[in-house]
Amino acid sequence: MKQHYVCQFNPTELAATLAPLQGRKLTILLAEQDCAQVALLQQLCSDLEITLDGAIFPQLLGAQGLLPQGAWLLPRPEPYQATLMPLPPEGDAAQLAQLITDQVASMLATWPALSPPPTLFLTFDNLIPNIASILDALYLQLANRVNYAGTNAGSGHFTPLACLFDNQRLLAYGVTCTLLPNNSFPFLEHGYQLSAQPMLATGSGANTITYIDWQPAFHTYQELIRQQFQHTLTHEELYHFAVHMPLGLLLANGDVIVRIPFDVTDEGALICSSEVSEHSILTLLKAPESATDHACSLARRLCQQQALTRAHLLEVYYCAGRQLHFGQQTVTELRTLLSDSGAGELAGALSLGEIGSIRSGDYPQFHNGAILCNGALV
C-alpha cells in the first residue's frame, strides 16, 4: 500500500483501507479538525497489529493544496523506528535532552550495522518552550551519530492539545523520536530577508522577549511596523503582521533564524514561536515575495541528493505562519516544489516549527517560517 489520504472515518471502510498494512509500521498525520478520531485509529491499528506513530497538525497538505480535515496514512518501510516519549514539564533543556539521548541511543543499538548515520526526526508538542535549547544540548550528546530534522505538532490556535500518539497513548508535552534511513535526509528553506538594522534582545527568557534595545519589546516592534507601513499595530493584529514581518536571529555564520511573535503580555513582552536567548542579535525580516523561487531552490537540492522520480513521495512540513503570509499562493509554492522535484505525490502538514539545517551537515536549528521536505520511495 502506498500513502493514502482519508477524509471519512467510517470504521468498516477504514479497517478495509488499513488491512493491507497488517503487521507493518504506519505514520498518521491527522488534521486538528478530526482530533477526536485518534481513539478509532488506535483501535483499528492495534487490531491489525500495525505499529503506529502519529501527530495532530492544524491542517494537512496535498498536491492540491491545504486539506483542512482528514488524515494521511504513510506506510513506513524498514528500517524505521519510532518511540513516543512524555517529557516532564519541570525539566530543563539539559535534562530533557538527556532523556531523548538515552532513548535514541537504545534505538541506534538495534539500527542496521554498517549503515550510514540515520536521520533523527523529532516531532515535538509545539507548546514546549525550550526546543531550541533542547536541540543544542542534544547535539552535544549525539553529535554526528545522526542527521537532525523535525517538526512541531499541535493546535493552530496555540492552545494546549494532546497532539502526539501511538497505539495506546495520546500525549501533550512530549516528543516522538523517529529514525529514518540516511537517504531520507530532509532539506529546509525559508527565504526571509533582513529589512532593518540589528537590535539587541536586552531582556528575554525561553520564548518571551521582554526588552529590545532596553525598550518594551512590543513597543519596539510597533515602531518598526510604523516605519514600514505607517500603521499603528494593535495587540490583536500582531500575528497577522508578524507572518509578513517576523523577527530574525542573526547567527555568527551569517544565517538567519525566523522567530514569529504571536502574542503580547500585559507588560508589553512579545511571545514568540520559539526561544530567543538573552543578548541575541535581532532584526526585522521581510517574508519572501516569490511563491516559486524558494520552491525551485529546494527542489534542486532534493534532486542533488537523489534522483527523484514519479515513484517518490515528497513529505512536506510547511510553516503555518508561512501559509498565512502566502495565502492562496501557498498552492503555487507546493505545486512548484512537486513539479520541479520530479516526484509523483506530495503529502504533509502545516507545522508550528521546523527542525533542520539550511545546508546539509550543518548544526541543527529550530526554525519558523520554513518548508521542510524530503523525498522517499513509495
Predicted regions and their residues:
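Hydrophobic alpha/beta core scaffold segments
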Residues: 1-378
